[in-house]
């Protein structure tokens, strides 16, 4: 049986892939993904929680939040437990795309369906990653432009 992941994570920290403050991520599927089909799962508005956290504790942007008593109690939940909504699956048709803020708490999920979940996943960092780490902007969208 399928179950929603208990917690997500933020990319860009030791043990979580690349070590950089991610600006944007993208997820798209090559096949339709139905509920329980291994979808990308995200915690709505968790990027705002993470932004507030790093504004309050800028010295923890390098991942030292994982060395705190709060981390020992809540793990990645420090970025998602207090959100306004429960996590959601990105259930979508082939070719649909979700662009997500780099501080959005997210996870993969188990595929209990007969159809494979095949997708493309991309992540981008700011060209001045070190500068972004030194100065967390007041607006979480400060470095974004369309």
Roles of regions detected by a PLM:
Residues 23-25, 87, 97, 119:
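Intrinsic-disorder/low-complexity, polar/charged segments enriched in Ser/Thr/Lys/Arg/Asp/Glu/Gln
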Residues 20-29, 44, 60-69, 76-79, ...:
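Low-complexity, flexible helical/coil segments
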Residues 1-42, 47:
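Conserved double-stranded beta-helix
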Residues 33-105:
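Double-stranded beta-helix
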């Amino acid at each position: 049986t399928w179950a929603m992941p208990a917690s997500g994570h933020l990319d860009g920290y030791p043990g979580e892939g690349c070590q950089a403050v991610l600006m944007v991520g993208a997820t798209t599927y090559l096949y339709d993904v139905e509920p329980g089909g291994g979808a990308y799962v995200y915690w709505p508005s968790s990027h705002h929680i993470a932004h507030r956290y790093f504004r309050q504790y800028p010295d923890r942007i390098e991942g030292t939040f994982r060395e705190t008593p709060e981390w020992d109690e809540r793990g990645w939940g420090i970025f998602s437990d207090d959100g306004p909504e429960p996590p959601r699956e990105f259930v979508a048709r082939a070719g649909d795309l979700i662009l997500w803020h780099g501080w959005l708490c997210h996870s993969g999920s188990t595929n209990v369906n007969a159809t494979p979940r095949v997708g493309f996943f991309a992540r981008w960092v700011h060209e001045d990653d070190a500068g972004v780490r030194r100065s967390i902007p007041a607006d979480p969208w400060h470095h974004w432009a369309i």
